Every structure is written in structure tokens, then in C-alpha cells.
UniProtKB/Swiss-Prot annotation:
Keyword Membrane in record: no
Keyword Transmembrane helix carried by entry: no
InterPro entries: Thymidate_synth/dCMP_Mease, Thymidate_synth/dCMP_Mease_dom, Thymidate_synth/dCMP_Mease_sf, Thymidylate_synthase, Thymidylate_synthase_AS
Function: Catalyzes the reductive methylation of 2'-deoxyuridine-5'-monophosphate (dUMP) to 2'-deoxythymidine-5'-monophosphate (dTMP) while utilizing 5,10-methylenetetrahydrofolate (mTHF) as the methyl donor and reductant in the reaction, yielding dihydrofolate (DHF) as a by-product. This enzymatic reaction provides an intracellular de novo source of dTMP, an essential precursor for DNA biosynthesis.
Binding locations of dUMP: R22, R180, S181, C182, D183, N191, H221, I222, Y223
Taxonomic path: Bacteria, Pseudomonadati, Pseudomonadota, Gammaproteobacteria, Vibrionales
UniProt binding sites for (6R)-5,10-methylene-5,6,7,8-tetrahydrofolate: D183, S282
Protein known as: Thymidylate synthase
Superkingdom of this protein's organism: Bacteria
GO biological process: dTMP biosynthetic process; dTTP biosynthetic process; methylation
Active-site annotation: C160
Length: 283
């Protein structure tokens, strides 16, 4: 929690105003932030200075794992995070590759589970990683990559957190996640949860111990219409005791995650938080 608040304060104190062409808004911006989550000791990075809706973050991650490309499928899992980008993004609405209501195109999990090969066919990156780790193999390339410039034109949004690199040391699994851009008041709240949970769940289904998850953010920013509530409300609140995160021990394989797992298979204990803050979302 401290490292999150320190980053927020750093942006407020040291950030530079940058015009964002996509949203038409200014962002207070810093370059490079490195966060670490101690999954081994269940130090769950859930924000306490406002209410955090962790279930939606886990649901979104589960949708990525399943390779979903439709906002309706994400809603069925328990999150509306893709409704706006699928249905309110003007550029995507006018894109001839859009297949209709709720279509997201080839973004995030689609790339992770079905990366198109130039000679035909597709690569299931996640399956390869799971198979390797289960066999105690780390080829220094256990990388899940969502960033495919050749298909940006057939997706509603470029990936923000675009790379997840898993590494084995003995029987302990580590994760390095890289994010090109982060809406800190809204997005980082989700992304911290997802990085933590991704390592925890991958360790569980591959029979490994979770270690630390390392989260690099390149462009960390606060939109101009988010600055006042961040500076004047959230940063003035005292952080509360950290919660703990738990996963149903019956989840044992990638197939389990693809089929029967729901949000009921994840729970948080001891979550204390301040009141919610309604930060504006920029499409």
C-alpha cells in the first residue's frame, strides 16, 4: 500500500503535464515506476484508502486467461470493464473490423491464447508456459505477450499491461509484468491485484511456490479531472491493515480456469477500507 501511495504522491509533486491525443485530456505524468508484491507471504496489494472492487479485477484476468474477445463474456464473469472500450470508443465504432455490439477485437487474451502466425495457424502462448512450468522447465522465455503491432487495427485498444514473464528458481515461481501506460487512480488499483493474482494462480496450477511479482510501469499518470480527488481526498487518508487473498485449492489446472472456475473460487479476508471515490474514466 505504501508503494502505491508513494507513486501517487510522486506524480502529484513531480509530474509533468502531457496532452493525451486519444482522450483529449491532459495527464500529470512521470516515467518509470517499479512495484513489488510479496505473493510468498500473502501481502495482498489491495488499496485501502478507498474501496477497491477486487472481484472485477480478478474477473478481467480470468477473461484474459480464457482468451475472451467480447465484453458480454466479461460481464458474465463479473466485470463491466470492457463495456466502454468495446461500445463507446468512437474510433472502434467506425472500424470496419468491428463485428458488432460488445466486440473487442484481437486484444489481450486473444493474443495470449491465439497469436496469429505469419505462415498460418496460431500460437497458444499461455498453454506453452503452463506446460513448461509444470515440467519444471524455464527456457528464459516463458513470456506471455499481448503486444502485437501487426493487429492493432483489429482491436479496440492497445494493451496497457502487455507482458508477463514467468521465471523459475528451484521450485519457486516469479513474475515480471510490464505496463506501458497506467491510469494510476483507476487502473493501477486493478493492475496490482491482477499481477499478484496471476502469479498466485499460475504457481498453484503448475505445482510451484509463489515468490515475488515485479511490476514495471513506464508511463504513470493522473488525468486532469482525477487530480483533485487524488490530492485532496485519497492522499489525505490513512492506509489501513492489509487484507489476505485466497484461492480455491481445488483449482489445479489451466483447464479448470477455462471451464468451471468463477469468482466464488476467490475470496479476500480482513479487507478494511475508506469510502469509495468516483474517479472519472477516460475512453
Amino acid at each position: 500500500m505504501k508503494q502505491y501511495l508513494d507513486l501517487c504522491q510522486r506524480i502529484v509533486d513531480q509530474g509533468t503535464w502531457v496532452e493525451n491525443e486519444r482522450t483529449g485530456k491532459r495527464c500529470l505524468t512521470v516515467i518509470n515506476a517499479d512495484l513489488t508484491y510479496d505473493v510468498a507471504n500473502n501481502q495482498f496489494p489491495l488499496v485501502t484508502t478507498r474501496k477497491s472492487f477486487w472481484k472485477a479485477a480478478v474477473a478481467e484476468l480470468l477473461g484474459y486467461i480464457r482468451g475472451y474477445d467480447n465484453a458480454e463474456d466479461f460481464r458474465k464473469l463479473g466485470t463491466k470493464t470492457w463495456d466502454a472500450n468495446a461500445n463507446l470508443n468512437e474510433a472502434w465504432l467506425n472500424n470496419p473490423f468491428r463485428k458488432g455490439e460488445d466486440d473487442m477485437g484481437r486484444v489481450y487474451g486473444v493474443q495470449g491464447r491465439s497469436w496469429a502466425k505469419p505462415d498460418g495457424g496460431h500460437i497458444d502462448q499461455l498453454r506453452k508456459i503452463v506446460d513448461d512450468l509444470t515440467r519444471d522447465v524455464d527456457d528464459r522465455g516463458e513470456i506471455l505477450n499481448f503486444y502485437n503491432p501487426g493487429e492493432f487495427h483489429i482491436g479496440c485498444l492497445r494493451p496497457c499491461m502487455y507482458s508477463h514473464h514467468f521465471s523459475l528458481l528451484g521450485d519457486t515461481l516469479y513474475l515480471n509484468s510490464t505496463q506501458r501506460s497506467c491510469d494510476v487512480p483507476l487502473g493501477l488499483n486493478f493492475n496490482m491485484v491482477q499481477v499478484y493474482v496471476f502469479l498466485a494462480i499460475m504457481a498453484q496450477i503448475t505445482g510451484k511456490k509463489p515468490g515475488q511479482a515485479y511490476h514495471k510501469i513506464v508511463n504513470a499518470h493522473i488525468y486532469e479531472d482525477q487530480l483533485a480527488p487524488m490530492r485532496d481526498i485519497q492522499l489525505k487518508r490513512e492506509p489501513l491493515k492489509a487484507a489476505t487473498f485466497h484461492i480455491n485449492p481445488e483449482i489445479k489446472s489451466l483447464e479448470d480456469l477455462e471451464t468451471w472456475v468463477t469468482l466464488d473460487d476467490f475470496w479476500v479476508e480482513g479487507y478494511e477500507h475508506h469510502d469509495p471515490i468516483q474517479y472519472p474514466f477516460s475512453v
